[in-house]
């Protein structure tokens, strides 16, 4: 049976309201006055139950920044999440909820689609972050970082999976994102176990893992769920997108872009946005003496920013020379849907950051047809976007004849 079309969550102390999906049950808190609405089909989108789109359907519903066009690169993949390219131009995709890592063979015949799909790994525990370095394929499962020998030319893995390091497993935010850093270390994000609480282990943090010794240490903390992060070309600065807490109304707190520095503390669970105290935890004893770093940029609330990837300097379309793409998975807990798009962030010479629409149309008139996760510039100059609702990867190409700057997007900031 389908869930009710609209489920309203009365925000009263001690009331638990379920939309028929255990993962969406919430405990409301007494000081809130805003009613949070969850609209069907968002629970279905969370569960990844969308239908695979055709190319015509994608072209019919998606709108892109001027000069860009989208096609379906691969479909019927399952709930596709993180994307990474191999040295041979093939595309790796994590299918987290199915425990798989796929390889999409590069488009050698030029028809705009992957030439084939191979399963590299299966039976994993919610694999999410993936990366390749030094002949190894690294995979971040919910409770461990593991690696296996990988031959990019043969498009094959060999030998057994080796555990590099163990991680705090499970929790409300169970995905672990992994990237190989410029220093050769592994950087792994571990989200919080809860909506808002004081953690007792290495959660709500970005961890640095030595790939040889397996030593794990906290690089940055106070990050509720920084699913996506990347290093900015030129400066080497590390930026991450963080998902703000729930149950403070439609428009607060914002999702954040943070410049992540070693030893940095970014506020959660004690402060949000421009370091405003949390109504539950702002005066918690554990907050005493801590100084949070302010966000570099604030997105709209609950847009669920899950990825950030900078354009390489040698493969940037005009107007995107110092820009990054952000996949906004979309809200489930607002009276009106937010996110469900890919945006671009642009750094001015003075450091000011502006946001523009890059790829929109995944949700229209309250109806969800897709949920973007990763948006990764490829070695061929195209952008590849994963959609874990439709089970697809889209290929976005640029045509200089139609290029023009898109409008600057300013999210609402009621705080």
Task: Label the model's feature ranges.
Residues 2-22:
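N-terminal Sec-pathway targeting helices
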Residues 73-77, 118-124, 164-170, 218-222, ...:
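Surface loop/turn motifs at the tips and blade-to-blade linkers of beta-strand repeat domains
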Residues 115-117, 126, 131-133, 143-181, ...:
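Asp-box/WD-like beta-propeller blade repeats and closely related beta-sheet repeat scaffolds
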Residues 76, 86, 133, 179-183, ...:
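Structural WD40 beta-propeller signal
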Residues 90-93, 136-139, 186-188, 238-240, ...:
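Hydrophobic beta-strand segments that make up the repeating blades of beta-propeller
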Residues 100-103, 136, 144-146, 205-207, ...:
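A short loop-to-beta-strand structural motif that recurs across blades of beta-propeller domains
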Residues 29-65, 175, 192-195, 211-214, ...:
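Beta-propeller domain segments
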Residues 83, 130, 178, 226-229, ...:
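Hydrophobic core register within WD40 beta-propeller blades
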């Amino acid at each position: 049976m389908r869930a009710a079309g609209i489920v309203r969550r009365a925000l009263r102390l001690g009331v638990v309201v379920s939309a028929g999906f255990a993962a969406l049950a919430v405990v409301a808190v007494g000081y809130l006055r805003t009613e949070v609405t969850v609209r069907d089909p968002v629970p279905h989108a969370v569960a990844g139950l969308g239908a695979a789109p055709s190319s015509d359907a994608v072209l019919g519903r998606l709108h892109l920044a001027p000069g860009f066009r989208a096609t379906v690169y691969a479909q019927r993949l399952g709930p596709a999440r993180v994307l990474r390219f191999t040295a041979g131009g093939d595309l790796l995709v994590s299918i987290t909820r199915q425990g798989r890592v796929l390889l999409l063979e590069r488009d050698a015949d030029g028809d705009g689609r992957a030439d084939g799909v191979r399963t590299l790994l299966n039976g994993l525990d919610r694999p999410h972050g993936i990366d390749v370095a030094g002949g190894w394929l690294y995979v971040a499962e919910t409770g461990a970082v593991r690696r296996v020998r990988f031959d990019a030319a043969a498009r094959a893995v060999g030998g057994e999976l080796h555990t590099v390091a163990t991680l705090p497993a499970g929790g409300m935010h169970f995905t672990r994102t992994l990237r190989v850093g410029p220093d050769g270390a592994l950087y792994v994000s571990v989200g919080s176990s809860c909506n808002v609480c004081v953690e007792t282990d290495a959660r709500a943090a970005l961890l640095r893992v030595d790939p040889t010794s397996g030593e794990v240490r906290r690089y940055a903390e106070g990050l509720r769920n920084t699913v996506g992060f990347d290093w900015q070309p030129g400066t080497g600065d590390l930026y991450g997108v963080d998902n703000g807490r729930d149950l403070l109304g439609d428009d607060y707190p914002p999702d954040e872009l943070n410049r992540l520095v070693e030893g940095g503390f970014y506020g959660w669970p004690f402060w949000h946005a421009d370091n405003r105290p949390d109504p539950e935890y702002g005066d918690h004893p554990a907050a005493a003496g801590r100084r949070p770093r302010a966000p570099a940029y604030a997105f709209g609330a609950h847009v669920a920013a899950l990825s950030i990837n900078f354009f390489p300097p040698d493969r940037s379309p005009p107007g995107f020379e110092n820009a990054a793409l952000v996949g906004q998975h979309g809200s489930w807990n607002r009276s009106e849907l937010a996110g469900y798009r890919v945006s671009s962030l642009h750094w001015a010479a003075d450091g000011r950051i502006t946001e523009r629409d890059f790829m929109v149309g995944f949700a229209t008139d309250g109806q969800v047809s897709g949920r973007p996760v990763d948006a990764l510039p490829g070695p061929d100059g195209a952008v590849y976007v994963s959609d874990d609702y439709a089970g697809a990867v889209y290929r976005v190409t640029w045509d200089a004849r139609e290029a023009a700057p898109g409008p600057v997007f300013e999210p609402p900031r009621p705080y």
